[in-house]
Amino acid sequence: MFEIKARDAMGRLGSITINGKKIETPTIMPVIHPNPKKQTVSMDLINKMADVVITNSYITYTTPELREIAETKGIHELIDFKNVVVTDSGSFQLSVYGDVNVGPMEIIDFQEKIGVDVGTILDIPTGPDVSREKAESDLIETFKRAEDSIKRRKEMGYKLALNGTIQGSKYLDLRQKSAEVMGKMDFDIYPIGAVVPLMEDYRYREVAEVILNSKMHLPTNKPVHLFGCGHPMLFALSVALGCDLFDSAAYALYAKNGRYLTADGTLHLEDMKDLKSFPCTCKVCSEYTPKQLYNLEEKEKTRLLAEHNLYVTFEEIDRIKNAIKEGNLWELVEERCRSHPKLLNGLRVISKYMDFIEKHDPVSKKSGFFYTGYESMNRPEIYRHKQRLDRIQYDKIYVTSVSENTSKPYHENLSNVPCDVDVLIKDGVFGLVPLNIDTMYPLAQNEVPDLYDFEKKYNNEFVSEFKEKHSEKILDISTYNYYINHYGKKKECDKINPDVFRVGKMLEYQYGAKILDEELMEKVKTRRSKNTGRIRNLLLEKEVLFTLRANDNFLIPAKSGAELLHEKLEFPKYRIVIDSSVEEYARAGKSVYSKFVKDCDPELRPFEEVLVVNSDDELLAYGTTILNGRELMEFDYGVAVTLRGGLKK
């Protein structure tokens, strides 16, 4: 069972429950050698740091003394780990040696027998440099083994959860096919396999594309494990692309070769030995100088170096979790990807998939948008803004430029004449910023350095296309000046209320429809904050319809506002339909759980304000969804909507 608690980009801070044990994602599974004598780092430390580990059932199966202990006392006793134990099936050995001495069903039976929490099918790992014909034939065999494994578990009543590994080599259409076929089977976790050769060769562009082409066709309600990814420098990008689990043998393997892991790359202890101190404050690095560690006996040096590598690995995972909570995961990704040019390739290629990524990225975040380089131009926040500009119902448009020194929000620092013309400011990052919505996230909640000339030109094509699309409504400067002069001569009673007009445009941008018609425009009023002087509420006959949330200026409906949205928005827009059995709970304002969602607006994005209705489209409640439209239909566990209020009968 998987539940999302917080999110940013496609990264998910979540909770997996397996056999009554909980794993917080994203997380790393340290690889544990099934032979305790060969385990580099003590299991006492592993038990303190990890919620989940991964070990090899094939080595256990083929080593008589290990097999005997595992079969009599269980895998947890063998490796001395109390929480969730995942096992590989021998697929790695198959990829290295070309053959294994165990059958696909035999290894499933064995994993169940030794009490594994999450087992793995014996799939066929297909490297990146094989022919398409070979990749296709391997995939067909993996599908057969997967189907047989699921059938075996069901027929035998096995309790173990199962990994269904996605294969397909470097062929993206085969990765898609693998995800589609495997996704229809009842697997609990979906590892993306055979990417280690790509990572070893720094082919991060291909790694990113393999992840995305798999994610697009996998069920959203199941965790995704990037098999073999153990270097912390790749975690942030992989999490941002939707990976929840990683496994690391790197902490031990690198230590044996004297390699010192950092979040930005790998250093060699031999090259560091003359430094006064380590660039780390973990227990190992605090107690030893580089020279002291380097001069230790080999076995002890390897153990301590492995401990450091494990510390820095978990530290990066914790840093990513915090970034998800704070809403600045993209900034961390951009920072990490600048640590190596090949990683930057991985970041740049994802712009091709922004239509997919944007669907998972929250519409609003705790942190502002920080521009850290040219790649920031392709972030989902900007992509979404450009798409949603077409939600605004324009009558007359004037496009202009402002001085680079003009502070945001623009409308507070320009002498703009109030009228019913939509004035759009050319913006180097966001393309166009309508003055009437310029306080909404992320248009005012951003920090951008002085742009280079080539960056300033990035949005020229977008602006030209927008103007061409709306050419009949575009005013030139002479017409605009004539119009505002003419408008200024109108009687006060004939003029629009600029604050109400502004809020109307904000509602269009946020909800994609005209919420305030002409009649309402004359009836509603705004109320400004006494502290900031900014618009805080929209009212109808002294009753609050919407509150402009201070941090992002999104319009949050009160009960009457929700009723207005329900009236103005056509079904299924911004709706979530729930089962009749929980109608009364919704009316009472209690959270809506995923398993009770029957239908929804497929275009919903995470953290949008939604209307909760029954099958007759009767408004029951209103609140915020943590899931997008597709996820709402696929998740069957955890909270779907946090309600702000319910409508009692």
UniProtKB/Swiss-Prot annotation:
PROSITE patterns in UniProt: PUA (PS50890)
Active site per database record: D88 (nucleophile)
Catalytic activity as recorded in UniProt: guanosine(15) in tRNA + 7-cyano-7-deazaguanine = 7-cyano-7-carbaguanosine(15) in tRNA + guanine
Binding site for substrate: D123, A194
Keywords assigned: Glycosyltransferase, Metal-binding, Transferase, tRNA processing, Zinc
GO terms assigned for molecular function: pentosyltransferase activity; RNA binding; zinc ion binding
Domain PUA positions: 573-648
One Pfam family per UniProt: PUA
Gene Ontology CC annotations of this record: cytoplasm
Domain of life where this protein originates: Archaea
Entry EC number(s): 2.4.2.48
SMART domains per record: PUA
Residue sites binding Zn(2+) per the record: C280, C282, C285
GO aspect biological process, one term: tRNA wobble guanine modification
Pathway: tRNA modification; archaeosine-tRNA biosynthesis
Cofactor(s) listed in the protein's UniProt record: Zn(2+)
Similarity comment text for this entry: Belongs to the archaeosine tRNA-ribosyltransferase family.
Function: Exchanges the guanine residue with 7-cyano-7-deazaguanine (preQ0) at position 15 in the dihydrouridine loop (D-loop) of archaeal tRNAs.
NCBIfam families, alphabetized: arcsn_tRNA_tgt, tgt_general
Protein's recorded name: tRNA-guanine(15) transglycosylase
Gene that produces this protein: tgtA
